[in-house]
Amino acid sequence: MSQRVVMGLKAVQAVAGRTDPTAPLAVGALAQELGLTLSRASRLLAELDEAGFAERSGGYGAYRVGSRAVRLSGRAAAPVARSLRYAMTLAGQLTGETVCLAVPVAGGMRVIASVESLWTLHAPAEVGELITDADSAIVRSAPGRNETSGQPGQSGHTGDTRLLESTIGMSVEIATPVFGPDGDCVAVLAVRLPTNRYGQNAQRSRHAVDTARRSIESTLVDVQGRQRPPGDVAADGVTPPSALEAAFRVLEHLAAGRDSVAGTARATGLRADRVQRLIDACRAAGMVVASADRTRYQLGWAVHGWHRAAFAPTIVERAKPLVAATANETRTCGFITVLKGMRSFTLVEELEMAGEGLRMAPWIGRPHPMIGSDGGPTLVMDLTAEEVAELFPTRHSKHELVQFLSRVREVVADGVLTMQAYDDAGIVSISAPVRDSSGFVAAAVCIVGTTSYMRDNARTFEEAARKLAADVSAILG
């Protein structure tokens, strides 16, 4: 039974841990990856589908990540989501390069978070990417890896014993392990940059990586010091679930924070001896980690990447019809924008316009400076004023920062922001926050139209923006 649980959890990771977990994965491909017969893989995926951790997609015998897996990922990532975004975005601002976070998984290191460089020529790091090259600084920074001394930029040390560097092809990695309060390595943080910018950016990147690492480790100390949120206690007499369903319940309980076997048993309604066996299976599958004294358990960080990797394709596929419906109903232009570094990036747009002879220029796939973006203040509303000020581009004046922070406070207070376009006369935008399964603001919906038309219908359109944001948030889990 434990082996079936282990294989089921490995199947979940195979489906959810990809760069695009919403893309169809054929049963045959999964069977080959896990070394299963086709019939066994098919039965396993059908069970995952029934449980909500996978769902049918595309043609017959293909599956994608399930909504329950996305919710598990977001819930597990929630305690560190805001601080992680801030630390990595700041490192990206200081260097101009790609910043990524990776965790050990079977076969290598998996990228679970990334802030990609906005340079035309850059070294990418995609959430879900599996790093397998043994020479990679990210791989060598993980616990249990051999470290080869050498010169910076040549797969060696940098002088700081916590920093390693490597050059693979035309890309340089500067990496450092991130340790939890118990002394365990929870992840590896790195900057990736092209070799042609190494000379001018290496020292800056080392400093940025080290600063971000310290910030994340400080957050981990705070998180561990918090009391676990109270959870529901399972009712007595509940029919024992299947082994795989029982494992999922254990994972969902641990996603809210570390707990003991006894605490997990009380919360899930399972016997303590069964919980111990399930936790052992979850550890064997690489999804649960133990405290140093083996008395408390929590989800490993590998699951944190699932909801992030699913985010953009889900928005494009499932939120676009919602934006189109709102734009058509209100006779406005509708957009969904996300944060890319400290720029706003449009993922979805629907261009309608109340005004004969007028046209809105398309923004799809184009980054825009945060200060002039319709959704800019909304996208950073989870950050503190001090954090926003530190991230704010230095080319802008203090007056512009004060005005921007005022708009951030407004959207925090009202849940919606109406503002005149920064550098586009005659346009008013209304934005509202979209939250992913971690509860963190991951996008902004924007309704845009001519000044007179938007002012005349302000209350109606503000409610439309709130509803659209809530509907998109529901899609994300």
Predicted regions: what they are:
Residues R64-S149, H304, R308-F392:
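Amphipathic alpha-helical effector-binding/dimerization core
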Residues P79, S83-A91, A137-T176, R204, ...:
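Short, basic/aromatic recognition patches
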Residues Q93, P181, I216, A256-G257, ...:
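Long compositionally biased, domain-poor regions of proteins
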Residues V127, G159, L163-S166, P177-T195, ...:
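Long, low-complexity, charge-rich intrinsically disordered regions
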Residues T332, V338, M342, V348-E356, ...:
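Non-catalytic C-terminal interaction regions
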